[in-house]
Amino acid sequence: GGTPFSCYPAMMKQRGDRFFTEGINNTLLHVYISQPSEEREPGMNAWFSSEFNRLNTWYPQMDLFTSYLKRVNYMLQQGLNIADVAYFIGEDAPKMTGIVDPELPKGYQFDYINAEVIERDLFVKDGLLTLPHGTQYRILVLPKLETMRPELLAKIKKLIEDGAVVLGPAPKRSPSGESYQTADRQVEKLAGELWSGLDGRSVKAVKRGKGELLFGMTMEEALKHIGCVPDCGLPADAPVLYGHRAAVDADIYFISNQKDETIELRPEFRVRSKQPELWDATTGRIRTLPAYEETAAGTVVPLKLYPYAVSYTHLTLP
C-alpha cells in the first residue's frame, strides 16, 4: 500500500517477519525490472509491487536487507516446523488457506491440512498425527461444516482409533454427488459411531480405540485436556510472533517484535537441557546467552527486542 516509491526495507521487514512466523521460508524480490537507461530515474517500473533495481534510492544499501532475508531463509529451512495443531480446511472449492476456529491461544503454532494429505499421508505414531517427512501434530481440528466425504471420515475414524486426538463437530452428509444418497448414509453411520454420546455440553470428550474425540471445547480447553503446554510461553498482550524449527541437534525459535518500541520479555521455550544462543539475523553475529532458567516445562530466556527487531534463540546441546 501507500504512494508509489514510498516503501523501503524497514517497512517491508515487519510484514516479512510476520510471514516468516506463518511458515514462509523462501523469499524472492518482486519486482526486479531491467533498467536499460542511465539517465531516466526512477526508470522503467511497474504499477504494482515494490521496486528492486539499481536506480532505486536505497539500492546501494539493499545488500543489508537481502543478507538478512538470506539468513532468515536459511535458518527457517533447517529441520522440521513445530506446530501442535493441524486445522483441516474442509472440502469446498480449492483454497490456499483456511480459518483458525476455534482460535489458537498465544504460544502455539498451527498448520493447515487438506483432505488429500489426510487420506494419503497422515498416520499415527506415538500418539501423534504424523506425516511421512516427520512433522507431527497433537490435535486435528475439523471445521464447523456439515459435509465430509465418507472416505475421508473413515480415515479420520481410523486415525482416532490408532491414537489420534480430533476436535470438531460431526458431519451430516457428503459434499460430493458421487454415490449420492449412499454416501450420505455412510457419513451418517460413521458419524453416529464416532460422535455417539458426545453432545459438546455435558460430554465434551469420548475415548475411541486408542485415541479421543473432542467436541464443544475451546482450543485452550482442548490443549489443557491433553496436557499440551505452550511451545513458546508469552504474555497474552506481548506484540510478539514466533516460529519454531527443530533440527537434529538444535531447536530454533524465531521471535519477532511487531511493534515500533523496545520490549523486554521472558519467553518460556518448550525445550530443556540445551544451551541458549542468540543468532542475530541482521548482523550474522552469534553469542551465548548465559542468563537462562530451566523449569519443569522448558527453558526461560530473558530477551530484549528493539523496535521491529528479530531474535533467533538457538537452543543446542551443550
Model-derived segments and spans:
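Carbohydrate-binding surfaces of carbohydrate-active enzymes
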Residues: 1-315
